[in-house]
Amino acid sequence: MKILVIGPSWVGDMMMSQSLYRTLKARYPQAIIDVMAPAWCRPLLSRMPEVNEAIPMPLGHGALEIGERRRLGHSLREKRYDRAWVLPNSFKSALIPFFANIPHRTGWRGEMRYGLLNDARVLDKDAWPLMVERYVALAYDKGVMRAAKDLPQPLLWPQLQVSEGEKSLMCSDFSLSSERPLIGFCPGAEFGPAKRWPHYHYAELAKQLINEGYQVVLFGSAKDHEAGNEILAALNSEQQAWCRNLAGETQLEQAVILIAACKAIVTNDSGLMHVAAALDRPLVALYGPSSPDFTPPLSHKARVIRLITGYHKVRKGDTAQGYHQSLIDITPQRVLEELHSLLSEEGV
C-alpha cells in the first residue's frame, strides 16, 4: 500500500504526527509512507524511519493558489498512491490528494471538505482531548475508535534517533566544551512573550546551573536571538563563558543533534519542546496561558510546571514586559528542583 500524508506546518505538530506514521507502519508493515510538508521539515522527517520520502510543499502556510495545487496533485498521479491522510484541517490542504486522484482520502472534516475527503471524520473534541490522539485515531477505520479510551495503549509516541558520533561532531563544530555537561534552554515560543518564561528567570537558572558545573546552551530561531542575548547580559563575564546563545545560529538539523547531546532541557511550550521529548531528553516544560491538556510533551521524562488551569486568552494587563503573570510566578528555584530530580533519575 502506498500512502501520502499531507503533514502539518508547525514543528510541534509535525513531531506529534509521527505517532500516526508509527501506527500506520505497525498496522500495515509493508506500507510505503510519503509525507508532503514544508521543506524545513525534512530534518525531522529524515529521522523518522517510518517515512519513505519527504515531499516538499512549495506553497506557503496561508496560500490557496488552487492552480498550483492542481498542478502538484496531477504531478503525483504517476506515484499511484492508494490512500491519503490529510492532517491539517484547512480546505486547501485537502486539494492535492483530490487532484492526485488518490482513491481513499482520510481526515477530520475540518473546513467543509465534503467531496475532497471521502473518508471525513466528525471531530468530537471531548472524546479526543489530545492532538496526538486525534492523529492516531485516523489510522483506524471510521467508527472503530469512538473515543481516546478505545485506542490501543501505549500510544506510539514520537521517537527521533541521533548517534553518539553525530553529537560529538556537532558539539565540536560549535566549539562546545567537553569539560562540562550541557543543559539546553529553549526560551522562545510562537506568538510573542506571553507563552515565555521571563528571560530574567532563565538567567537566574543559568547562573545556578553554571555554578553547579554545567554549561548552558540556548536554542531557538532568529526571532529568539534577542531573548537569548538578554539572558546572557544578566550573567557576569565568568558565567558568560559557559553560556552560548545559538538561537538563530543553527539549522533545525543542527539543533536536533545538539538537543540530543544535552543532559536535560528547560523549555517553554514550543516546537523544540516536542523535539526534545522525541529525543528522550529529560525536560522541564513551562506552561502559562496555553494548556498542556492538548499538546503536552510526549515523554515519561517530562515534568510540566503550570500554576493555572484551563485555557486563557491573553488580555492587556495580564502581562508584564509581555510575560504572563502565571509564568512570572514560576520561580527559578522550583525549576531547578525539578531539574535536579530528573537528573538524579538519569544518574547525572
UniProtKB/Swiss-Prot annotation:
GO terms for molecular function: ADP-heptose-lipopolysaccharide heptosyltransferase activity. Its EC number is 2.4.99.24. It catalyses: an L-alpha-D-Hep-(1->5)-[alpha-Kdo-(2->4)]-alpha-Kdo-(2->6)-lipid A + ADP-L-glycero-beta-D-manno-heptose = an L-alpha-D-Hep-(1->3)-L-alpha-D-Hep-(1->5)-[alpha-Kdo-(2->4)]-alpha-Kdo-(2->6)-lipid A + ADP + H(+). The keyword Lipid metabolism does not apply. It comes from Salmonella typhimurium (strain LT2 / SGSC1412 / ATCC 700720). It comes from the Bacteria. Belongs to the glycosyltransferase 9 family. One of its GO terms (cellular component) is cytosol. GO terms for biological process: lipopolysaccharide core region biosynthetic process. Keywords: Glycosyltransferase, Lipopolysaccharide biosynthesis, Transferase. This is Lipopolysaccharide heptosyltransferase 2. The keyword Transferase applies. SUPFAM superfamilies: UDP-Glycosyltransferase/glycogen phosphorylase (SSF53756). Glycosyltransferase involved in the biosynthesis of the core oligosaccharide region of lipopolysaccharide (LPS). Catalyzes the addition of the second heptose unit to the heptosyl-Kdo2-lipid A module. Pathway: Bacterial outer membrane biogenesis; LPS core biosynthesis.
